[in-house]
């Protein structure tokens, strides 16, 4: 952090901290913005050390400026931060970011005019790499370096065809000829299916170029170059000298840039195939930090085949809509005009250990409260206990068994001697209003005597026959258990025979 924060020091740092982020806003630049810019440059494979000088800031701005219209919000924020830092290095007085960007663009326009004037005065053509001018004044081609090819192959091996491959290809192929671009494509060993898709896209674009730029009838005039066809732009039917001549003619025909656009168009289709996840499916997990969610969101957004207006709408709508409930509540409270920096600052603690502990405590309190309510509804909640009262001294907090006061004589209820409390007749009435002493028999609401039943004697219809003891026992069993035998149900019961 110290190395990153050492970009500015002394008076420049004071000037940096006086510049406002927005016109008329309260927030101002701080060290954390320099640290963030350094990390973003590392993420875009740029050297953070360039921030220490105004020339380095110019180089960074030159790399970022082509991506401003089609880039993400992070690229725009990085561009604005570097532009403000450039004004601080050049000691240009600015009040806010907007004024700094305007001042920087004015400086760029002035330098462009000077360059154009110098080119017109010397009547020289552009000398962009890899086409350079030798000591004899001739325009020669400088072949692409093995280091550049190695970096390109390494990106393909590590990233396959993820969205960041496209800006990496664009940076490595700056000013390249069609022959250089074909060399870069031929170094890709694997992913031949993707390469075949790329060839089909290039052939389609070449056919479209031939349709829109038909060849003029008749021979080419002496001293003039022929117009490039689609296959010439792709480098299959043109030589390196012809490509250099087209790119350095006046006016130039940028065959390298045209071919580069075709390749990027094909790479976009490949990235779409290798990244099948739709931006609609990117949702923040319940415990995922908001920063990681934003990274995944913009990475998928780069692979979307849509215009910049559609991507802006996706960012404004889906970024908030697909956040988890905790972050969504915070983002809606910020309002629709909140910047990405404000969103990430507001949601910084969501998903961390402190936030998890707070959410868990709230959930536990809710569960405990609901369980208490259920117990009270079911009648299991007994409420506060009643205080214990001593029968001996009449005080609360202990029983008569543990009472230290002198034992009270007689009944503890009426105070009279001669009986105990269990035999006390005072206010011991039943619900009929009658006093029931325990020594006078049964209570008044019970039957005081139990009469014996007076059933008539059993009649005998034996007509004098003699009854054997077994028959007597059978008759007695029938009287006691009328259904014990199966005769009444199935006739003769074989078990009784």
UniProtKB/Swiss-Prot annotation:
Residue stretches of biased makeup (Low complexity): 116-125
Residues forming the motif Nuclear localization signal are 26-32
One GO term of the biological process aspect = viral budding via host ESCRT complex
Where, by residue number, is the motif LYPX(n)L motif?
Answer: 480-489
Region listing for Interaction with membrane phosphatidylinositol 4,5-bisphosphate and RNA, in residue ranges: 14-33
- Which Pfam families did the record assign? Gag_p17 (PF00540), Gag_p24_C (PF19317), Gag_p6 (PF08705), zf-CCHC (PF00098)
Per UniProt, what is one GO molecular function of this protein? RNA binding
Which residues lie within the region annotated Disordered? 102-125, 437-497
Where does the entry annotate site (Cleavage)?
Answer: 129-130, 360-361, 375-376, 430-431, 446-447
Extract the ranges annotated as region (PPIA/CYPA-binding loop).
214-222
The ranges of region (Interaction with host PPIA/CYPA and NUP153) come to 186-224
Zinc finger feature spans (CCHC-type)? 388-405, 409-426
| Motif (Nuclear export signal) on chain | 16-22
* Region listing for Interaction with host AP3D1, in residue ranges: 12-19
The entry's cellular-component GO terms read: host cell nucleus; host cell plasma membrane; host multivesicular body; membrane; viral nucleocapsid; virion membrane
Q: Where is this motif: PTAP/PSAP motif?
A: 453-456
Record-listed Asymmetric dimethylarginine modification sites = 385, 407
Q: Output the PTM entry.
A: Gag-Pol polyprotein: Specific enzymatic cleavages by the viral protease yield mature proteins.
Q: Where is this region: Interaction with membrane phosphatidylinositol 4,5-bisphosphate?
A: 73-77
Residue numbers carrying Phosphoserine: 145
Q: Keywords on this record?
A: AIDS, Capsid protein, Host cell membrane, Host cytoplasm, Host endosome, Host membrane, Host nucleus, Host-virus interaction, Lipoprotein, Membrane, Metal-binding, Methylation, Myristate, Phosphoprotein, Repeat, RNA-binding, Viral budding, Viral budding via the host ESCRT complexes, Viral nucleoprotein, Viral release from host cell, Virion, Zinc, Zinc-finger
The UniProt annotation puts the region (Interaction with Gp41) at 7-31
SUPFAM superfamilies noted in UniProt:
Retroviral matrix proteins, Retrovirus capsid dimerization domain-like, Retrovirus capsid protein, N-terminal core domain, Retrovirus zinc finger-like domains
What family does this belong to?
Answer: Belongs to the primate lentivirus group gag polyprotein family.
The text the record gives for the protein's domains is:
Late-budding domains (L domains) are short sequence motifs essential for viral particle budding. They recruit proteins of the host ESCRT machinery (Endosomal Sorting Complex Required for Transport) or ESCRT-associated proteins. p6-gag contains two L domains: a PTAP/PSAP motif, which interacts with the UEV domain of TSG101 and a LYPX(n)L motif which interacts with PDCD6IP/AIP1.
Q: What is this protein called?
A: Gag polyprotein
């Amino acid at each position: 952090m110290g190395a990153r924060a050492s970009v500015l020091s002394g008076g420049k740092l004071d000037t940096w901290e006086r510049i406002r982020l927005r016109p008329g806003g309260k927030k101002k630049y701080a060290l954390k913005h320099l640290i963030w810019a350094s990390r973003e440059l590392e993420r875009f494979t740029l050297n953070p050390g360039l921030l220490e000088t105004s020339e380095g800031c110019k180089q960074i701005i030159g790399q970022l400026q082509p991506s401003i219209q089609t880039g993400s919000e992070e690229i725009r924020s990085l561009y604005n931060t570097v532009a403000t830092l450039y004004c601080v290095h050049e000691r240009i007085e600015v009040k806010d970011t907007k004024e700094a960007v305007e001042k920087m663009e004015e400086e760029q326009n002035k330098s462009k005019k000077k360059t154009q004037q110098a080119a017109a005065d010397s009547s020289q053509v552009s000398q962009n790499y890899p086409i350079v001018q030798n000591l004899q004044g001739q325009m020669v081609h400088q072949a692409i370096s093995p280091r550049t090819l190695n970096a390109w192959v390494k990106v393909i091996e590590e990233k396959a065809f993820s969205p960041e491959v496209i800006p990496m290809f664009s940076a490595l192929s700056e000013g390249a000829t069609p022959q250089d671009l074909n060399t870069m494509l031929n170094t890709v060993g694997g992913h031949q299916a993707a390469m075949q898709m790329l060839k089909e896209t290039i052939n389609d674009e070449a056919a479209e170029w031939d349709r829109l730029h038909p060849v003029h009838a008749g021979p080419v005039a002496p001293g003039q170059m022929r117009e490039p066809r689609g296959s010439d732009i792709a480098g299959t039917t043109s030589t390196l000298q012809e490509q250099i001549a087209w790119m350095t003619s006046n006016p130039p025909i940028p065959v390298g840039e045209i071919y580069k656009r075709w390749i990027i168009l094909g790479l976009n289709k490949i990235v779409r195939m290798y990244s099948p996840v739709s931006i609609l499916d990117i949702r923040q997990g319940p415990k995922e930090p908001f920063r990681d969610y934003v990274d995944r969101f913009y990475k998928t957004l780069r692979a979307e085949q849509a215009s910049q207006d559609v991507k802006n709408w996706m960012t404004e709508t889906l970024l908030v809509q697909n956040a988890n409930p905790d972050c969504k509540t915070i983002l809606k409270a910020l309002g629709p005009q909140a910047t990405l920096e404000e969103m990430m600052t507001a949601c910084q603690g969501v998903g961390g250990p402190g936030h998890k502990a707070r959410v868990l405590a709230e959930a536990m309190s809710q569960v405990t409260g609901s369980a208490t309510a259920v117990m009270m509804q079911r009648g299991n909640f007994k409420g506060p206990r009643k205080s214990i009262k001593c029968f001996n001294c009449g005080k609360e907090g202990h029983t008569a068994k543990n009472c230290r006061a002198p034992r009270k004589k007689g009944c503890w209820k009426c105070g009279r001697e001669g009986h105990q409390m269990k035999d006390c007749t005072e206010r011991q009435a039943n619900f009929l209003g009658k006093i029931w002493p325990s020594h006078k028999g049964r209570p008044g609401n019970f039957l005081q005597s139990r009469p014996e039943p007076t059933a008539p004697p059993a009649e005998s219809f034996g007509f004098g026959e003699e009854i054997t003891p077994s028959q007597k026992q059978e008759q007695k069993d029938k009287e006691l258990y009328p259904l014990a035998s199966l005769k009444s149900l199935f006739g003769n019961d074989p078990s009784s025979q």
